[in-house]
Amino acid sequence: MLDVNFFDELRIGLASADDIRNWSFGEVKKPETINYRTLKPEKDGLFCEKIFGPTRDWECYCGKYKRVRFKGIICERCGVEVTRAKVRRERMGHIELAAPVTHIWYFKGVPSRLGYLLDLAPKDLEKIIYFAAYVITAVDDELRHNELSTLEAEMEVEKKAVADQRDADLEARAQKLEADLAELEAEGAKSDVRRKVRDGGEREMRQLRDRSQRELDRLDEIWTTFTKLAPKQLIVDEVLYRELVDRYGEYFTGAMGAEAVQKLIQNFDLDAEAENLRETIRSGKGQKKLRALKRLKVVAAFQNSTNSPGGMVLDAVPVIPPELRPMVQLDGGRFATSDLNDLYRRVINRNNRLKRLIDLGAPEIIVNNEKRMLQESVDALFDNGRRGRPVTGPGNRPLKSLSDLLKGKQGRFRQNLLGKRVDYSGRSVIVVGPQLKLHQCGLPKLMALELFKPFVMKRLVDLNHAQNIKSAKRMVERQRAQVWDVLEEVIAEHPVLLNRAPTLHRLGIQAFEPQLVEGKAIQLHPLVCEAFNADFDGDQMAVHLPLSAEAQAEARILMLSSNNILSPASGRPLAMPRLDMVTGLYFLTTEIPGDIGAHAPAGKDQPEVGVYSSPAEAIMAMDRGALSVRAPIRVRLTQQRPPAEVEAELFENGWQPGDAWVAETTLGRVLFNELLPHGYPFVNKQMHKKVQSAIINDLAERFPMIVVAQTVDKLKDAGFHWATRSGVTVSMADVLVPPQKAEILDRYEKEAERIEKQYQRGALNQQERRDALVKIWQEATDEVGKALEEHYPADNPITLLPKSGATGNMTQVRNLAGMKGLVTNPKGEYIPRPIKSSFREGLTVLEYFINTHGARKGLADTALRTADSGYLTRRLVDVSQDVIVREHDCGTERGINVVIAEKQTGPDGKATLIRDAHIETSAYARTLAADAVDADGNVLVERGHDLGDPAIEKLLAAGVTTVKVRSVLTCTTGTGVCAMCYGRSMATGKLVDIGEAAGIVAAQSIGEPGTQLTMRTFHQGGVGDDITGGLPRVTELFEARVPKGKAPIADVTGRVRLEEGERFYKITIVPDDGGEEVVYDKLSKRQRLRVFKHEDGSERPLADGDHVEVGQQLMEGAADPHEVLRVMGPRQVQVHLVNEVQEVYRSQGVSIHDKHIEVIVRQMLRRVTIIDSGATEFLPGSLTERAEFESENRRVVAEGGEPAAGRPVLMGITKASLATDSWLSAASFQETTRVLTDAAINCRSDKLNGLKENVIIGKLIPAGTGINRYRNISVQPTEEARAAAYTIPSYEDQYYSPDFGSNTGAAVPLDDYGYSDYR
């Protein structure tokens, strides 16, 4: 078998008949499969052992040779080679066809490659192939030209003979008529009898004339057809063709069926045709030029490759190995077989019948019919259902052909090559394991025993608990006592991988150290639930076991959960306290003035209370019941660093780091701060979820990951402990309805009645009434919400949950205790009657009914969203899978400018710097492309420095507003990106490693939150067209589609002339440079004019006489990215796409770094359309990689030629995926047959650069530790190491002392030996 590690590229091409015969181990001659009595394969049949190899290892068919000692012998009786049975998986056979057939992919695919090659319309080609028309394959023009006059004379003679014969016949008939009439007259016959005879005679004469005219017309048609006869001409009329063959057979040849196509291909001159087509492209216009371009693609493909076009017509059909189309016996003696066997049987049956008919010399019509049936059966074998009705099996089910085996989700590519089942794995329900450390998981004993079975068995033998592996296996299966001790030893420090489906991003698989637990459920650490998106309502997880030392090392170093605290999408921590833990820490750090033991200053009669010399003393007081954990106290601290603002004051008073200081805080906060690492400033705040998140964020920036992991573990333990101690419970008594609710609703009800009256009087129309009511009831709902918040006491547990950030929000509390408010109908519009009841009071029947619309839509949306989001992720992964960090620095000077702050002038005229809201996702974690300097030109941060939070703060403090940073958009690495342009890896907080699969991480980061995005297109008040939002908008942007209701953009800078019609606007821009006016016609008024800031600082819609800049949007809506590219160029379209995608995600509160979106956008803009090919090899109109385009142009210019001209093109992600260089990757994505057809014709070679290609062929992927840079490392010893390994003694060494020993590697002193014995 082929070893995948020994080849570097994979080429696909067309196989000739000789290739097929060379692959084959014998011809399949019979349609038989297995003998139903002996259950052995039939000789020369589809499962024949002689062709495909023995069914049993080392045993021939007749049983003469058995056992391995006869290896390689071919049995003289049955002809079977004695070898392993597994050769039946790789040996192919073939069927020798009695007549050639065309390959359906090349004839029926769109576009028809055969049609383009031969310049025949697919309809005509079909007529030829399926025996409905003859085609002229060759014409001897010279001979015809030379003999044309002779032939014409002959034809004229024949025509004259026909005419003479006609005249003679007519003359004779006329005479006979005269004689008959004369006779009748003599007999005195009546006039009507005479008339009848005359009519009869004239009719016969007319028929004679018609017959001879038809004969003359036929001769004319034959002659005309013959004189105009040209190759590739179709003749549908069989009689005409036969006549032509009989008369002029020596001047031309013609045929029908695949034989005709084969002859046409054999006579085809590729070079001459290519030259003609190039000439047509140079001089032609319109459709003619387009068709020539398309044809040239196919012709050039054959011209530039080793392929012969003859491969599209088959003389032999390969038969795939029998083990790949098995036949198995079921209970009850029936057989289940692969559909392919049925399809092969049809081909063999028809082929054998055709051979017999040809041998018998059957009439041509019968033979042609059989040939057509053979063609159809081969079509069905290759691609059933592509032409005509599919061949069906039992129960009218279409049979699965070879193409169907490759296509779709169940096809070979996606089902078996890109996703395989894995051994050493298990799955079980998950339960929470709060006692675990962050890097641990609980593994059920029985599952661990099964997973680690081989390891346990080996260890049992090593420790002499068992004599051999067999007895060790028995011990494990019987679960002897020693087994458990050995299992404990074996699993120590052997990480396992846990995976929860769906694995939406890379944190869906993480490594943990297993801890054995009782029961059958896997225990999961509560902090990793966020990354897995797991909860404990019945979720299941799979466990996988890394076996080799390398796999274990990768799992431990790269995948251990404590090393994956940060989100790869935003670089912010994911392993953060949630839910109960947040509640516990919030409770712990709350301050309640006047609680038990609270600090009180010294009075007249009483000493100062609530002052403690150390945290230990305060804890003792709490244990005694003299102090509440939430009471404000003063306590002397030595271990913790004071907060920054306190520290500044203390320094002024002569305090030194390490001295004690007094904090005014609560015991809870002191306990909380003891959980934080040493040296972290004291946090004297109530711990809302956001504050906790900011602290962990800060820890991740400042401390090593191991410290962060230990800290979040401590926070988890404290959170659970204090959540339990807090006793937060929720009951009906806690749901308090605000007493002002009735009064508020009455007030707004009167307001609504007023609107109704105005509507009744006709003062308002339907839409205005609706809008007014919606506004009124929204205000009412908000007011009830406010009243509710004021009414709830601070210690109410229901409001504690949203306030602490643990779960829920105040809207849900409002629904529970206030009022539900307005709901939408199925169209997504507000129903103007609100739901006035709260869930506590209960809804009326009508309220309940209208509420169900929204609830049902929500569920339907979620289901649709999940599928759409998954598909989007799949396309994103496919387009970006070969973006891998290939080198440290590409050396480019280019970069992009990013705004980090904006200058704003206040009312007092002072300029203040406002930090940019999106700094987290734009400038953060990037590398500087140029020195960042302040106003005086001092360098603040040097080029090549990483922009972390401290560096950004420094720049903001110095008043810097814009920085130039490196970006993947400007990276010049050939394939993939360089580490400096990519910047910091969001998941590790350090510069990205070489080998990181940046593209896949980007795709996952964008796809994973996809499910959270909304589906619906929302109505904006009064706008007729819906504005697309949510997931459909992201898809629309990445697919580079023209948006729905697109807004025009200004092509030039100039003044606007606005004309308003009844339903449309007409905008004309008069350019500043005096160029031609640009007119935008028929702009719907429903779309509204764009509102923007004008020169005078006001914000208003576009008006007549306004000045617009190039690229400015003129109407509301979304701009077309293709227009932006055309008008503004590639850089602006990149900015546009990144901002528009971020707009959608930000609206849902999802944080994704710009660099991920940039990776995808870079892939969309990778190609160039060739406008003029110059002296290059490119075809005009073809798409090519920008890097290839530039390198080819450099080569041509160096040789003194004309470079090609091209323009950048924006491709949607699906199109870009299919246009990838790797045919394996494209075929496994979509449109498998089309991609393979194209790749085979072009004889495409796959360099195996991406990830999918390598997964498919089973090689290590060229990313991470599989990248060549790491695989090709060899150890070079240093000089010191070499000296230590190979010591050469000097003469002073003790080796030359009298006790000189052997085997020291020293020189032998020959003079000390006597040689007398040897002489």
UniProtKB/Swiss-Prot annotation:
It is an enzyme of class 2 (transferase). One of its GO terms (molecular function) is DNA binding. Mg(2+) binds at D535, D537, D539. Binds 1 Mg(2+) ion per subunit. Binds 2 Zn(2+) ions per subunit. Zn(2+) 2 binds at C890, C971, C978, C981. It comes from the Bacteria. Its cofactor is Mg(2+); Zn(2+). Belongs to the RNA polymerase beta' chain family. This is DNA-directed RNA polymerase subunit beta'. The gene is rpoC.
